[in-house]
Amino acid sequence: MTVVIGVLALQGAFIEHVRHVEKCIVENRDFYEKKLSVMTVKDKNQLAQCDALIIPGGESTAMSLIAERTGFYDDLYAFVHNPSKVTWGTCAGLIYISQQLSNEAKLVKTLNLLKVKVKRNAFGRQAQSSTRICDFSNFIPHCNDFPATFIRAPVIEEVLDPEHVQVLYKLDGKDNGGQELIVAAKQKNNILATSFHPELAENDIRFHDWFIREFVLKNYSK
């Protein structure tokens, strides 16, 4: 039985996610206990084939509008709210899966999944985007130097359900007026959210490999 990872391909950086998952499958296939495949997802028939879904960075407003206008929103909503499925939202994907937005909320009809309040464009304009070396070793073994790229990135301003949402990583406050910024979190063991773009870490598949091992395969084996 093949476990299928879908990458939402309505808009945004979906190809980069596909390539990273493909690289994981090629390089680690002997270490995964299940056969894996990856596919782009543009409609409900493709979505129905998936066990997990990555919602990429891009433009959350455009993503939301396309899903509504094509009649795809309800299918996406049902998928991500199914506890047997796995969802990962990166950057715009984090915005799209969140329950609340603290700014520009009327522009995006979210999937109302992740129980957090999110601020859009918290890092400013595109010219203020940056890559920061982050120590994720508290949740990814030996990953203490990951290049996390933030592009007009959102941040999690508030966790609305601390019982089920776990903060995985905060940026230190030295460049943010002393305020720590939540940029990675998970809800239960099947929903992951990141402000940054792991798919833009060239030739570095550690984050995607961890997602596959800790979310996709563990959830599938239940």
From Swiss-Prot:
InterPro entries associated with the record: Class_I_gatase-like (IPR029062), PdxT/SNO (IPR002161), PdxT/SNO_CS (IPR021196)
Annotated L-glutamine binding sites: 58-60, 120, 151-152
Reaction catalyzed: aldehydo-D-ribose 5-phosphate + D-glyceraldehyde 3-phosphate + L-glutamine = pyridoxal 5'-phosphate + L-glutamate + phosphate + 3 H2O + H(+); L-glutamine + H2O = L-glutamate + NH4(+)
Sorted UniProt keywords: Glutamine amidotransferase, Hydrolase, Lyase, Pyridoxal phosphate
Family annotation (Pfam families): SNO
UniProt-listed Enzyme Commission number(s): 4.3.3.6, 3.5.1.2
Gene Ontology MF terms: glutaminase activity; pyridoxal 5'-phosphate synthase (glutamine hydrolysing) activity
A GO cellular-component term linked to this record: glutaminase complex
Pathways per UniProt: Cofactor biosynthesis; pyridoxal 5'-phosphate biosynthesis
GO BP terms, alphabetized: pyridoxal phosphate biosynthetic process; pyridoxine metabolic process
Classification via SUPFAM superfamilies: Class I glutamine amidotransferase-like
Positions annotated as active site in the UniProt record: 91 (nucleophile), 197 (charge relay system), 199 (charge relay system)
Highest taxon of the lineage: Eukaryota
Similarity annotation: Belongs to the glutaminase PdxT/SNO family.
Note: Present with 195 molecules/cell in log phase SD medium.
Function: Catalyzes the hydrolysis of glutamine to glutamate and ammonia as part of the biosynthesis of pyridoxal 5'-phosphate. The resulting ammonia molecule is channeled to the active site of a SNZ isoform.
Protein name: Probable pyridoxal 5'-phosphate synthase subunit SNO3
